[in-house]
Structure formats: structure tokens, C-alpha cells
Amino acid sequence: MPEATILLIIASIVNALVLSSMYILLALGFTFLFNIMGILNFAHGAIYMIGAYICFFLATAVGMNQWLAMLIAVAAVGLFGIFMERFAFRPFFGNINQIIVVCIGIITVLENGVSVSQGFIVQVTPPFVQGIFRVGIVSISWERVVIFLIGISLLVLVLLFINKTKQGLQMRAVAQDLEGAVLQGINVHFVSALACVIACALAALAGSLMGSYLSLTPYMGQDIMIKVLEILVLGGIGSINGVLFAGLIVGTLDAVLPIMVSGTATQAIMMLIIIIILLFKPQGLFGKEVRG
Amino acid sequence: MKKISYPLVLTSILLASFLVFMSLAGCTKTATTTAATTTTTTTTTVQPIKTYTVGLLAELTGFLGSYNTATVNEAQIAVDMVNENGGVIVGGQNYNLKLVVEDGQSTLDGTTAAANKLIFNDNVKIIIGPDAYFNSAVSGLCEQNKILHIAGYCTMQPGEMDATTTYTFLGQAASINYFTGALAYLKANYPNVKTVALAMPDDGSIPYFGAAVQKMVQAAGYTVAGSIIGYNNSAVDFSPYAAKIIATGADAVICCSGIALPNGSILKDVRDAGSNMLFVICNSTIPTDNIKVAGTTESTNVVDCSAAYIGCPNPSAILTEMIQRYQLLVGNSNAPLVTLEYANPIWELGHVLNQANSFDPAVLKNTFSNMTSIQTLYGPGTISGLKTFGINQAVSYQLPITTITNGVPTFQTWEPALVP
Amino acid sequence: MILEISGLTKNFGGLAAVSGMNITVNDGEVLGLIGPNGAGKSTLFNLITGVIQPTKGTVVFKGKDITGKRPHVIAELGIGRTFQLNPLFPNFTVLQNVISSFQIRPRSNLFDTFFNTPVYRKNEAYILEQSLEILQLVGLYKVRNELAKNQPHGYQKMLGVARALAIKPELLLLDEPIAGMNPDEIDNTIEAIKRTSQLGVTIILVEHNMKILEICNRVVVINFGQKIVEGTPQEIKENPEVIKAYLGSGHDTQH
Amino acid sequence: MVVKGSMIAAPNSNTHRKNLIPAIGYGAVICLLACLPLIFKSPYILHLFILTLIYIIAAASMRFIMTSGQIPLAHAAFLGLGAYVSAVLSKHVGLSPWLALIIAALVSMCVGIAISFPFARLKAFYYAMISLFFGVGLLQGIESLGKLTGGLAGITSIPTLFSTGSKVPYYYVFLALTIISLAILYRFESCRIGWNLKAIDQSYLVSSSVGISEVKYRVIAVAIGCFFVGLAGGMYANYNVTISPSSFDTTAKLWMIIYVAIGGTNDFAGPIIGTAVLFLIPQYFSGLKQYTPFVSAAVLFAVIFAFRDGLVSIPRLIRTRYQRKKVKVQTDDS
């Protein structure tokens, strides 16, 4: 086997891992919100984009410390989550059509708002960490390593939150049986608002990180959204652990397919694979019960 | 059992149609006013100056939105500059140019609708733009209705520009220009490059532009490593493509067309993956943008054939003025120009109108295609393109070549990026 | 003998909801199927009507093996059923509920239906008149034009029966027809069931309310997915095992 | 989905009078629509009307599928499929555009049937998601066919239905096609087929217990819906001369369901009104250039928060309000 091929294979494996962790990072907030609260946030991509732009703005225009900027972006977008819960999700809970309408409205406003206000300058948040990390013939930029680590650790944190903390348990209670939860004296609105805050914060975090890895465009959220939905359905509804494996599958496909087929065909093949998987496991890989 | 409440539904249908009626009545009103008319304005010149309306087709919303909003600003500046130099003189009468802008929404059918609006609603006889492959929606329409069409860009896809679209001109350097410029420089200054890999966005242009590029590369005596690598413009991560490029084992990679995001990302990923191969970027996006995306440490050993940018010696006084006005407009003293993709055609149009001394598109197109040299914002340009497009209607002019080392762009030379 | 269940078993992940059930139902009788909560009565119904597939065993209806057939096929063969929970189309009116339950006899093909041929119109007219009759039978005629979801619980249950009758069943499975009803609703329901069985329809009742026994010719008591005893209502009332089985269990509706 | 009206014409005399009012109404609307080219001479405005007609067919067919409780997020992709099939047939194969139109509709229907057999097992949310994925995949697949479909740049200079450049014949032909399609869809919905679809939507368990085959009727719904959306796609391609994937992408898919939802999913007239309003209002404000999208967003929010059952619910709301005023007795109910 020629050396080039071996390099290609190794590179693909590395890419698959890193890309998967990126997708896990992206999908975490969305899947969390849907699996735990049964809320389908179609505007996740737009929120991710807003988070990226806020972080960019603070880090470059204001000249703030990068990590601080990220934290502020996360906080700000988290607050936006309360707004989302109150005006987008609570009034239309369970009606997918109306949720789509509201979310499209929000997406339109956010994307065009950014597009109009920012004007055309290629915008990139400066990298959080510099340099390249070499092991033998494999070499990755530290940025990607950081994204990888953050993605995985966030997943663990969210799992801990759901299973160990009081709020996490309350969320699951609300999701499983609303009336029961109310009878138990759980403040349902508080719980769901909390869930939305967490979800949006996670989206913003992903946005800030990816914004430094890729460049920012007002429409960066659109393609992300499809990926996120793929991961949600593939992972199975009602299972956060599913995200890990779904993310791995989608990431690997995205890392390997472009090497075999060119350009847009990758997406088609990918969808085909995903649909086939779902036809054999309609509940997704780790799905428990159907909701929504 | 009650029948469906159709009377009520019908009232709402009527209501809706009434609303539509009103709205479109509004449209017609605007149409009559904005049609190419004669509103007199008083200026320094002796006789009153009439205004002549020119249509500008831009993608103001959608994924090209922010970009084209900027280029439309440039176009407006160009119009002001033409008017301040006395406008255009046709039949001894001075005319000020006036732009009517329509939005193509970054979709082909949106662009078709906008073109329809310009032609049938705003009654313009000259259309500038649109961007990228959206020309394919306009060229045919203009041919049908005998409208002069000066495209702002061209990706060489069918319907954009060929022997059948005689009313269509390419008024601005397109992907083919940037490529020829880069190739010529590469040939002259990098003798040790033998094999090159080709990468370009897989937006359907590979069978056309890609094929042409491949031929030209081989004609220049290079061997193309592997097939053309088509990347997905909207990919989240470009490292797979980078891996693919490195795996070809070529001495250099040429990224044809495409925008800053994919090109910069691929550059970054190629470097991160540990390869230091020569990286040639030939597209309108300026070097500083590519550096922004790729990062300073990663952007090294790069040759970039691009539009004019801050730091390259200005080819003409007009361009200097253009830059100053643009910076004034956006209120940023060192904002780079975008690409002039609409400003350049307008500037040329002024030249052509003066030469032709008529507003008749048929006359204009003959004059335009028979001009040996034309005045562009980049200085004198030539008209060619018979070999590439089948018609001699593409304007080409000198383009700046830049090398980048450790994130520092260094201007090298002006290449006469001729369209064969 | 209209229905014969032999060795019917259903396991939900290890534990057996129904195991080795053998029941035979004779023509025109009213068979009571009683047992405490979670005894597997509803599961048995779902097995008969093909909503869930049995692990093993067979269901034979009129000498025809219907084990594991799709629910709508079984319905076509003439087994009607009602449901414990939300037994109707909530957004149809009561009459529409019954009309739209006429799928099999008469059935007009797509062509007739679309082109509104005389055949289709004849069928629909017939269906309308039949539906009104059925509503008379179950005593819902006066509320026929009101939305089903706005009806009281008892009416909804009766509507369930009416819908089941609309497919002209030879065998009718009633899943807790009187659960959660008030006394006079119960009396009406029992009246209606009696009238129905007089039309020659074989009926199987699931109930864990002993009161229903008085209209049954025969009663089967099941617990933990198995048949405990079988006999006339009188025998059952005295049977010590039944008493025992019932002591532990409350009388609220099943899951 | 709330269901109104009767499945059969109740055989009492005054239904004739009942049916008369809508009949007159229809006549009025059709006359109005037929007169439009005489009112508006501008080809551009006719262009807008023609596109509206096409989208109305698409939206109405989408709603028809939705009556069975399936949310076909792939519908815009089917519009694209129809458009591409008829474009390829009439341009590359050289069939007559009219024939291509019909074939496009049939192909779209066949694909719809083919996918709806495996998908019929899936319940609401999963169906929506998988059809979304299928739509994306289908579009990307079409896009990646290289020279045949011209990738992202799409197909240009598609043979047109009429040689004349005027848009008036298009308007009348498409108006006729739209009316026919809507009539057929309305017939399907008001006969037993439509009722069975609504029954399945309300409870597939109950409907199967009375002998309604869920799979059969879901497939029927998808087949009919896809046929008409394919037809609309073919009309679009042969009228618009140029098509590209970006016209049918994810955003388009979601906008399509918005046309339906804003108009109102519960009523046949919903998608018609929704499309007319949502497609034409932004056109009216197109003078705002890059600020136009905010207008459509504003319309969305206004409608969804004011009348969540869509625009068709306005008259009903007004009426109930009026009745409340009249009858002060039951103010506490509702």
C-alpha cells in the first residue's frame, strides 16, 4: 500500500473523530431540548449563528478576551432562550406546523438582521488556541483538539446534569407525564425555560467555537440544522446517549464520503444511508418511544 | 349537517384578491413613474440634463445578500462618478445615469422574476449584473427582448454566455480571468512545479469551467494530478478535501473560483495536515480575506490572483477615487473594495454609450463588441473571449498577483489576465 | 362455535401477559371475560383483533385461521371491537363517526367514490339510513349532530359500540363497556348490549366489574394471563378462587 | 384536524339553496381571476399571478397529504422533481412540453408511491423528519447529476409551452389547470376517501378496527398529492424557462408548509389564501430591497399569534365573537 494512501486513511480517521465531536457539540443543545422536553427548536441553527456573531463582535470590535467573549455570548443567548420558550414554544407546544412557522419567522429575522447589519466583510473569530499538534505522521491543529475535548466533556456534563441533578430529574418527569409533574408541585414553566436556556447556551457555545474554526456567514446555521436533525432522529428520540453514536456515524460519513465521491453527491448518498438505517430501526438507534 | 362555511371562505378569498389588486395597482403606479422618463434637473451645464434609467440586477437577499449589498453600493458610486464627469452624451444631449435595482433573492427563479420586473415593469433597455451563475436566468430573456445585458461575473455554465446570447457581455473579470492570470504567473515564476491538483466548488461548473481549466493547464505543460476535486461549498469541515488534495501528491494545488470561506479553509486544513505544497488561489476574493479565514501561520507559500485590494499599487486614478468614496460611504478609512462587479460594467457602459451615441441596444452591442480597447476602473481593458465563449464580448484587464508568506501579502505584479 | 383460541401466548420482554389461553366462543352467546387489573384481558382483545402479534398459539374465527392478520383485515372478516380509552374520532360528529365506520358492507370502490356514481350515492344513502338506525338502537339519536369529543363519557362508550356495529360484525368485542359510568348509564348500556345480542351478534365482554355478569351466558375468569375458571355467572359468583383473585384488586379502571 | 361538513349530501331540499351561495361565490372569484389580465397589462404582474397559481396547486396538494396526518416536508423537493423531469424531457429528450408536463406528474406520483410504502409505518414526527431527509437527498441527487441537470446552476432555456412571448396564454391555461386540480382535490377530500384520511389522522387504531387500511389510504394520499405537485413543478419549469435546486431547497420546503399553515390546515381554502397572501405581499414590498424578508417575517408572526388556525379562521372568529356578544348567557364556556 503506497504511503499516500496510508496517510489518507489515517487522516480520514482523525477527521472522522474530530468532525463527529463537532457534530456532537452542535447537536447537543437541540437533542437535549427535544429529548428531555419534547420541544422541537427549528431555530437552533440561527441561534448557533447568533452566538457565533456575538462572540466575534465582542472579541474583535470590542477587543475583549476571547474566552470571556465566549462566556458572555453564551449567557446572552441563554437569556434569549427564555424569550424563545415564552413566545415560540409554550404557546404552540406540540403543534409541529405552528412551531415551524414561528421558528421560520425567527430564523428569517435573525439571518437577515445579521446580513443587513454586518455588511460584507469576511469575518472570523481569532483562533482560541494557536499551533499544530503533531504525533508521528498525524498532525492536527490544537483548535480541533480543543473542539474535540470540549464536545466530549460537554456531552458528559449534560448526561450528568440529566441523571444526577434535581432539575434534570424534574425535566424528565415533566417530559414523561406533565399532569403528574404538576401534581408533584414541579414548576413546569420554570423547568422548560431552564431547558431552553441550557439548549440555547449550548448552541451559542458551539457557535463561538466553530466561528473561530470556520468563518462566519449569516446563513451558517442552515446546513447545520439538517445535520442536527439527522443526528437527532438517527440517535433515537428520548435518548441523549444516542447523540454520541449518531454524531459518530454522521461525522464519519461526512469525513469519508467526500474522499470517495465528489461534491454534492455526498449529501445524497448520506441521506440514502440514513434513510435506510431508519427504515430498519424506525425508532432510531437508541430510541425508546415515539414523541412529537 | 352544516355545509362548509364557504360563503365566509369566499369572502376571505375576495378579500385576499382585493389586497392583491391593491398591491399590484401599487406596482403599476411605481412602474409608470420609474420607466425611463425625462425628469429635468438643473446643474452647471448649459442645457438641462435628462436622466436615463439603467437596470441593476443584484442578489440582495439570500446567501449572496450581504456581499451584493456591498457591490451595489460600489455600483452607485460608479454611477455618481459617471454623472459628475458630465454623464453620457447621446445625440448631443447630456444624460445622467440612474440605477433601478431589483433583488434576485440568490435563487435562479428569483433572478428570473427580477429580470422580468426590470424588463416589463421598469421598462429598462440595459441590465447590469447579476452575480455568478444567475446570469443564465437573464441572458436568454435579454436575447428574447433585445436588452443589452452586461454581466457582473460568469462561471461559464450553459446559458450564461455563448454564441446564442449576442446581447450579453461580460463586463468584469470572471473566474476564467483570475485563472489565466494565476496560470501565467505560475508558469513564469515557479519552474520546479510539474504536477498540479485542481480544486473548485462542485456547483455544476466542473463539466464546463473545470474542463476548460484542465485543458489550459495541460496546454501549459503541467500534468494534472488525479481528477478535479469538487468540494461542497457548504461543507462544515473541509479537512476531508484537504486530505484528498494532499493524497494526490501534487507540487501545487490551484483553487479555481470559489469564495474565501472554502478556499481559506482548505488552505488552513492543508497546512494543518502538515503539507507545505504551493497553494494557488485564483478568485475575486482579496488575499487579506483568504488570510483571515486561513489564519496567519497557515497562510504561507500562497500565490493569489485576485481583485484589487488595499496595499496593491493602484492601476488608475479612478480606482483611487472609487476606493476613497467607498471608504467614505462605509465610514471605515481602510475598508477594502469588494469586487466592483457591478461598478466596472457601469463604468464601461458610460464609455460605450458615449462611443455609440445611441441608447438602442442593437447599436450598443455592435459598438461594444467592435471596440478594440475599453476604459475600465482597472485602466485600459481589451475585449476578447471568442475561444472561450464563442463570442467576442468578454472584457479583460490586468489583475494583481500577490504572494503570501506567514500571513503577509506581498504584491508581485499586474498580470494581463486575458480571456482566450 | 364461532371463535376458537388455543394456546395463545404473548410475552412482553420476558413476562407473559397472556400464556397458553384456550377459549371457545359459541354462536350467539354473550361471553363475559373478567379478571383483576393487568390480568391480560385487553391484551387478549388486541391479540384477537391483530393489533399486536401473538408469540405463539392460534386464533380461529369461523374455521378460518386469523392469527397475526392485520387489524383491518380482521375487521373485514366480521369482528368488531370497542376500545377502553378514546374509542372514537373526536373531531367527527356522532353521526359522522358511525357513517365513517361503514367501510365494508356496503363498500364502493375508488372509481365510484370519486366520480360519485349512482352506485356510490345509493350506498351512501343506505349507509346514512343504517347509521341513524344504529344510533336509535344505542340511544344516541338525539345528539347525532354534535361533535363526538363533546359527549359525556358514557355516550362516547356507547358511540364506540355503535361504530363497532357499523361493520355488521358477527362477533363483537366490548372492552370494559361500563367502566367509569354512572348507574343509569350502566343500565342503558346493558340494555343496549342485550338488544344487540338479540340481533344475533356474538358478544365477548371484558369487564372487571362483577355487575356485568348478569347478562352473560358464560363467564371466563382470567388472572396473570391464565384462565382460572369458567362457568355460568352463578357458579362464578360462588367460586372461592375468584373471590380470592378479587380481594387484592381495586375496582378502578384497568391501567 | 377539525372536520367540517357532511360526507354525503343530506337529502333534504334546502341543500340546493345552501350550495347556491358558494356556487355564486366561485363564479364571482373565477370571473374576477379571468378578468385580471384585462386589468393588469404589465407582463410582470401576470408573471407574479402565474407563479401564485403554480404555488397554489403545490400548497393545496401538500395540505391534501396533511389531512391524513402526514407532514410531507419533502413536498418542495417533489415540486423540484416534477420541474426537473419535465425540463430534462422537453430539453434533452425533445418531447413536447405538454407531454413532458404529464410525464413529470406521473413520475412524481410513482416516486411518491414508491417511498410511501416503506414510510407508511412511520408516525407523525418520524415521517416528517424522514421525508425532510428524503427531500434533501432527492434534491442533492438531482443536483449531482452533472451535465443532465446542470448542478447548482440548474437548467436554462427550457422549451416553453407557447412559442409566443406573451404571458396571457400561460395565465389562462394555468388558471384552468389550477381550477381543475383544485376541483379534483376538493372532490377527493369531500368524498369517502378524504374522510377516511381524516379518520386515520384522528386515530389509526380506531380506523383500522372498522376496516380502514392505514397503509392503503396513506399511499393514496401521497400519490394524489405528489401527482399534483409534480404537475405544478412541470408547469413551473416550462413557464419559468430556468430552474435550479436553490428554488426547492430546505428553506423552500419549510416555506411551503408555511403557505399551508398560515392559510389554515383545517380548511380547503387555507393553502389558497395563504399562498396568495404570503407570496404576493413580499412582492409588493420588494421596493424595500434587502429589508423585504422582515416584512414576510412580520406577516408570519402577526398571523400565527393573532389567528393560530390560519387566515381562513378569521370569518369564523368574527362570527363567534358576534354570537358571543348576542348571547350573553354562556360567556363562561369556551
Identify the meaning behind each predicted range.
Chain C
Residues 1-255:
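Glycine-rich phosphate-binding loops of nucleotide-dependent enzymes
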